[in-house]
């Protein structure tokens, strides 16, 4: 598996014959020219996870790609989209994608909680090869190989980021959702996640593929 980070929560997961793009949002850049996608997978409706303005062109460039999103998000998009419910199991190429969780993390008690799907991808080598939680601290009940772990968010303290990484305890982790952190301050967050866990933690260079 190769992972390419396009900033914030946008990650390209290339499994060889099957390629998935997660959360192409408005804080992410460089994904616009991607072709050959098998699927585009959206965790929830917030614009930093799905840029409705750039999505149609991305779909036009990838006519064979399915678009998956929760029902709330699907209803807001002006493009064909397959609605995903918690508990669904999707077959995309030689991959199995499971839809888990269901709810966005609480930002504030006065802000309504929206849908959020955490996606767990299995390949022929590992049933939980890669997990993208979106904006949620969902802890699966099985071992995860590579976790895209939120580094910072309006709905999360750094202590919660550390505790979440400890709770999931993946074999390896890569940080996402760092677009709200000034570049010069990101090392503070990454340092806590590295020093306070025993996880193999790797920061992905933007727009460069890394093999796992």
Give names to the regions the model predicted.
Residues 53-61, 160-164, 189:
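A short acidic, amphipathic alpha-helical/loop segment
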Residues 27-69, 145-148:
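Active-site metal-binding motif and surrounding structural segment of the metallo-beta-lactamase
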Residues 46, 72-73, 103, 137, ...:
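Catalytic metal-binding/acid-base residues of hydrolase active sites
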Residues 20-21, 41, 68, 132, ...:
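Structural motif
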Residues 1-4, 78-89, 162, 166, ...:
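Binuclear metal-ion centers of metallo-dependent hydrolases, dominated by the metallo-beta-lactamase
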Residues 49-52, 157, 183-184:
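Conserved alpha/beta-hydrolase "acid-adjacent" motif
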Residues 63-71, 172-179:
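Short internal beta-strands
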Residues 1-35, 83-143, 155, 160, ...:
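Core dinuclear metal-dependent hydrolase active-site scaffold
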């Amino acid at each position: 598996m190769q992972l390419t980070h396009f900033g914030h929560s946008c990650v390209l997961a290339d499994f060889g014959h099957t390629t998935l793009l997660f959360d192409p949002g408005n804080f992410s850049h460089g994904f616009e020219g991607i072709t050959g996608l098998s699927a585009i997978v959206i965790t929830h409706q917030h614009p930093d996870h799905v840029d409705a303005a750039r999505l149609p062109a991305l779909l036009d460039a990838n006519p064979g790609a399915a678009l998956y999103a929760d029902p709330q998000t699907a209803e807001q998009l002006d493009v064909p989209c397959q609605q995903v419910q918690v508990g669904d199991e999707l077959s995309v190429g030689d991959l199995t994608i499971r839809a888990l969780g269901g709810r966005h993390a609480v930002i504030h008690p006065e802000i309504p909680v929206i849908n959020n799907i955490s996606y767990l991808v299995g390949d022929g080598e590992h049933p939980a090869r890669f997990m993208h939680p979106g904006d949620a601290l969902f802890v699966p009940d099985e071992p995860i190989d590579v976790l895209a772990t939120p580094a910072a968010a309006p709905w999360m303290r750094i202590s919660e980021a550390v505790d979440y990484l400890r709770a999931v305890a993946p074999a390896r982790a890569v940080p996402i959702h760092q677009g709200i952190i000034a570049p010069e301050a990101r090392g503070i967050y990454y340092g806590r996640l590295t020093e306070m866990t025993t996880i193999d933690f790797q920061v992905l260079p933007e727009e460069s593929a890394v093999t796992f």
